[in-house]
């Protein structure tokens, strides 16, 4: 009921809500694990096998059956039993469960976590079932892939793909874009380094069915904060934000990035990457939800991002236009 109320309150403010979902695995404390509906409800119930985390193998024309089995059937960690989407009862349950949540809550879209790990034929069936029922709905799959060819495989109707797979998926998380921009701001300019990485990466957009539907981002809960990654260089941070708000795709800002969050270790860890916003809890000493609780640097970053985001709302070219860019020279990258 609280989730439904949140969505309705967001709608009253002209906002939309994206639900985070996952069909790859459950937690080991899920009630299913106390009495599995069928013996084959999860993979490898008798003998633990861990995934290899190599999602790019799905698009690899030379991938071995051994690697594919470990990827799809292996568990993320011992606490996350891997669901078997080849089980027809589970398939039906997951599809109906999704439709129920949309009907009940009025949620506007879904971000599907760990999209590369479940059975890919099931994922295409799930996407088609949802989008054929809700024509103005959107789904973005978390496609953690290291390069554009591996990422583009997961977007709908990729022309010329050798195995003929059509994911039906409208949007993917554009990790190659994120990696290129993060490194582009952190490295010295060179033939293959710095801003050249952004240029080379965008030059592969022809591989995507529609790169404008890619979700682009600078950091997330599984990565070091972008401000930390660029060495806490404020200018580099602002350029990265500018790229986020002016290049093709759907920009996503991870909470805390609007306040230029960093952490002590550059590599960081889950606790550092997922730190709470000051003011989220009653015993916090300050709150960033009000300008009076922010530091000068946090306020500067907030105003910079808010200004660009508000400008982007009315900048039609960033939503519908075409892009033209020039080969970077002497550390300068020009695009329109």
Task: List where the protein language model places each region.
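Surface-exposed cleft-lining segments at the edges of enzyme active sites
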Residues: 109, 225-229, 323
């Amino acid at each position: 009921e609280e989730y439904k109320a949140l969505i309705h309150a967001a709608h009253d403010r002209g906002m939309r809500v994206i639900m985070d979902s996952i069909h790859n695995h459950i937690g080991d404390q899920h009630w299913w694990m106390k009495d599995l509906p069928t013996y084959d409800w999860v993979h490898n119930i008798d003998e633990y096998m861990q995934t290899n985390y190599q999602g790019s193998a799905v698009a690899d024309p030379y991938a071995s059956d051994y690697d594919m089995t470990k990827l799809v059937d292996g568990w993320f960690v011992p606490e996350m039993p891997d669901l078997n989407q080849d089980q027809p009862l589970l398939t039906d349950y997951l599809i109906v469960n999704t439709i129920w949540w949309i009907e009940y809550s009025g949620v506007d879209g879904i971000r599907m976590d760990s999209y590369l790990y479940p059975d890919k034929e099931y994922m295409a069936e799930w996407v088609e079932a949802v989008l054929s029922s809700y024509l103005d709905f959107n789904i973005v799959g978390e496609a953690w892939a290291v390069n554009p060819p591996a990422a583009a495989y997961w977007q709908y109707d990729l022309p010329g793909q050798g195995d003929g797979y059509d994911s039906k998926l409208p949007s993917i998380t554009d990790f190659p874009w994120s990696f290129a921009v993060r490194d582009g701001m952190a490295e010295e300019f060179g033939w293959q380094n710095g801003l050249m990485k952004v240029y080379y990466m965008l030059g592969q957009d022809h591989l995507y069915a529609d790169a404008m539907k890619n979700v682009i981002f600078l950091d997330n809960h599984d990565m070091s904060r972008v401000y930390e990654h660029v060495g806490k260089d404020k200018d580099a941070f602002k350029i990265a934000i500018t790229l986020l708000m002016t290049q093709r795709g759907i920009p996503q800002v991870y909470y805390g990035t609007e306040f230029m969050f960093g952490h002590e270790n550059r590599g960081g860890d889950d606790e550092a990457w997922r730190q709470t916003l000051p003011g989220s809890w009653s015993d916090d000493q300050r709150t960033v939800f009000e300008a009076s609780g922010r530091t000068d640097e946090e306020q500067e970053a907030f105003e910079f991002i808010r200004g660009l985001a508000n400008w982007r709302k009315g900048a039609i070219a960033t939503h519908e236009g075409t892009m033209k860019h020039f080969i970077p020279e002497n550390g300068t990258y020009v695009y329109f």
